[in-house]
Amino acid sequence: MDLPGPIHDFLLVFLGSGLLVGGLGVVLLPNPIFSAFSLGFVLFCISLLYILSNSHFVAAAQLLIYVGAINVLIIFAVMFMNDSEYSTDFNLWTVGNGITSLVCTTILFSLLSTILDTSWYGVIWTTRLNQILEQDLISNSQQIGIHLSTDFFLPFELISIILLVALIGAISVARQ
């Protein structure tokens, strides 16, 4: 950010003190849930420091990956492991599980048949790819966005499907 010197210094000291307080909270708080939330605050302050140093894409990646995914995973694991009571009436198979597995299997086979029957060499991702890349793009974020939406579109979408399946699996494990 292009800020005047005193404002930049104030924000730097404010975020640094937030990092110190959050780090002390991670180490000193006795409840692991509060420690995990404090870790999320530390990671959020780090992303704000990236914004302060004009690294906007790194800040967005920090928020999405570390605060949004890793910290949520840590909180999920802590909450899952703190449950000392185990359910004694655990049903291995219910009607809902059968319906869900039937729907998921149908979707899987329809996706597999679509993927195998499609001629991927004939697909034109975009007609203006060379024109877009020849332009002077303003930032690295725009270049990454162009490559994700053209060259790496299919792997990007496959990763999003894998993450969706992992999220659904985590929710189903947490509900049991």
From Swiss-Prot:
GO MF terms here are:
NADH dehydrogenase (ubiquinone) activity; quinone binding
Give the membrane topology. Answer: Multi-pass membrane protein
Q: Enumerate the transmembrane spans.
A: 10-30, 32-52, 61-81, 92-112, 152-172
- UniProt EC number: 7.1.1.-
This protein's GO cellular component annotations are:
chloroplast thylakoid membrane
Q: Point out the coiled-coil segments of this chain.
A: none
Q: List the catalytic activities from the record.
A: a plastoquinone + NADH + (n+1) H(+)(in) = a plastoquinol + NAD(+) + n H(+)(out); a plastoquinone + NADPH + (n+1) H(+)(in) = a plastoquinol + NADP(+) + n H(+)(out)
InterPro entries this protein is in? NAD(P)H-Q_Oxidoreduct_6, NADH_UbQ/plastoQ_OxRdtase_su6, Nuo/plastoQ_OxRdtase_6_NuoJ
* Chief location of this protein within or outside the cell: plastid
Q: Which terms are listed as keywords in the entry?
A: Chloroplast, Membrane, NAD, NADP, Plastid, Plastoquinone, Quinone, Thylakoid, Translocase, Transmembrane, Transmembrane helix, Transport
Where does the record place it?
Plastid, Chloroplast thylakoid membrane
How does this polypeptide assemble, per the annotation?
NDH is composed of at least 16 different subunits, 5 of which are encoded in the nucleus.
The record describes the protein's role as:
NDH shuttles electrons from NAD(P)H:plastoquinone, via FMN and iron-sulfur (Fe-S) centers, to quinones in the photosynthetic chain and possibly in a chloroplast respiratory chain. The immediate electron acceptor for the enzyme in this species is believed to be plastoquinone. Couples the redox reaction to proton translocation, and thus conserves the redox energy in a proton gradient.
The entry's family comment says: Belongs to the complex I subunit 6 family.
Would you tell me the protein name for this molecule? Answer: NAD(P)H-quinone oxidoreductase subunit 6, chloroplastic
